[in-house]
Amino acid sequence: MKISLSPATPEAWSGSVLALGIPENDPQGLVAAMEQRFSLQLSDWLKQKPFSGKPGDCVSLPLLRSDCTALVLVGLGEASSVDRDRLRLAAAAAARAAQGQGGTLGLLLPWSSDTPEEDAAAAAEAVRLALYSDERFRSKPEPSPKPDQLELLGSLPGGLSHGLEAVHPVCAGVELARELVAAPPNSVTPAELARTASHLAHEHGLELTILERSDCEERGMGSFLSVCQGSDMDPKFIHLTYRPNDAASKRLVLVGKGLTFDSGGYNLKVGAAQIDMMKFDMGGSAAVFGAMRAIAELRPAGVEVHMLVASCENMINGSAVHPGDIVTASNGTTIEINNTDAEGRLTLADALVYACKLKPDAIVDLATLTGACVIALGDEIAGLWSGDDSLSSQLEMAAQAAGEGLWRMPLHSPYRKGLKSLLADMKNTGPRPGGSITAALFLKEFVDAGIPWAHIDIAGTVWSDKGRGLDPSGATGYGVRTLVNWITNQANT
């Protein structure tokens, strides 16, 4: 989709679909202006529709004998309450209303005079991401026509076009994450993730190292390797690196959970455990892949970024890990596996040890780790655990700017006793109460003291059955925009 600015007013703009954000009571008189332009009794028509300018209101009116094919009105709520999140939702609603139409979408929203560039970029991202559809696995794809050009109307500075250049790389990263999460487990395997990394490295000049099973054995990654004992698929430990053109003053590491399918192992997922949806247990790896895709094109200065994904399947056969087995992680920590369905933290443990050896300035891991986080925060907010206030604030600000829900949770150290094992250094799960906290405390054991680290549990946010906001139903690509914001912010400090 081509994105540009247009100096035209809504009274003069011509294109396929004209979409206007309308606050309650229409203080700017846009409805009256459209009545005059299109010779419509628009006010009378709106009285018959559920449209009063409230958030969520959206109506589309086909236009005959006009240089536009449709007029879309999107409610914004009280004018004084319009913020960037509301602009995103309005832009996404306008995009969906324009679906089925080709050509150009003209969009007018009340851009902030203080942050017009950020508002415009957020709206442009919302339009592109809301129009996303996945037809890869249909025998007869039925793609709906959609606008191929977006023109942003209103009082936007002419130099703002440069700021919109980041929209396409960021959206491409989100779309990559969505594709990886949505694809079935017979399509996205550990080997396929490795091929995806190879493609990114080749296309964008990134460095790539892939550790095979024997390489992981040499490094003592017994925690990671225990998870894949029952799978015929070979594990892949993927290390992708972005290096800036200039000297790097910061080194950041992104770690993503990469379980391409999780049966639960001998603690088999049954009942409401959604075994049929466990293709999305690699949502953390999808997020960091998407972030690297965007960063590779944006090329922020002064920051070096490493992506680590310990990818495998958790399956059952005669060689699969047993409940009660004791394994040794690459830092020498022994772990009693009291639940084979708490496997993600076992893969992340060795990835975090590897990350620390890179001597980073910060580590952030993302994982679909616990159902407890979903119970606590629902499906629109991810949980954040960190003992570093500065890193937590950076990530919260990055998520807020991205419009992605993120809430800091307590890393309550007294709960560490719940991981105590009679035989090993620790168990891989604690009591059911506070399960997402003990999961984070488990991961903390594999991060060197003094290295800022944050864990983001995206179990609820990685998928949306019905769609919400910018996200169609299915994979959301959550986390990509937050990570990109965080990295680019670090590049600027």
UniProtKB/Swiss-Prot annotation:
Binds 2 manganese ions per subunit. One of its GO terms (biological process) is proteolysis. It comes from the Bacteria. GO terms for molecular function: manganese ion binding; metalloaminopeptidase activity. It holds the Pfam family Peptidase_M17_N. Keywords: Aminopeptidase, Cytoplasm, Hydrolase, Manganese, Metal-binding, Protease. Its EC number is 3.4.11.1, 3.4.11.10. It is an enzyme of class 3 (hydrolase). One of its GO terms (cellular component) is cytoplasm. InterPro entries: Leucine_aapep/pepB, Macro_dom-like, Peptidase_M17_C, Peptidase_M17_leu_NH2_pept, Peptidase_M17_N. Its cofactor is Mn(2+). PROSITE patterns: CYTOSOL_AP. It is found in: Cytoplasm. Belongs to the peptidase M17 family. Presumably involved in the processing and regular turnover of intracellular proteins. Catalyzes the removal of unsubstituted N-terminal amino acids from various peptides. This is Probable cytosol aminopeptidase.
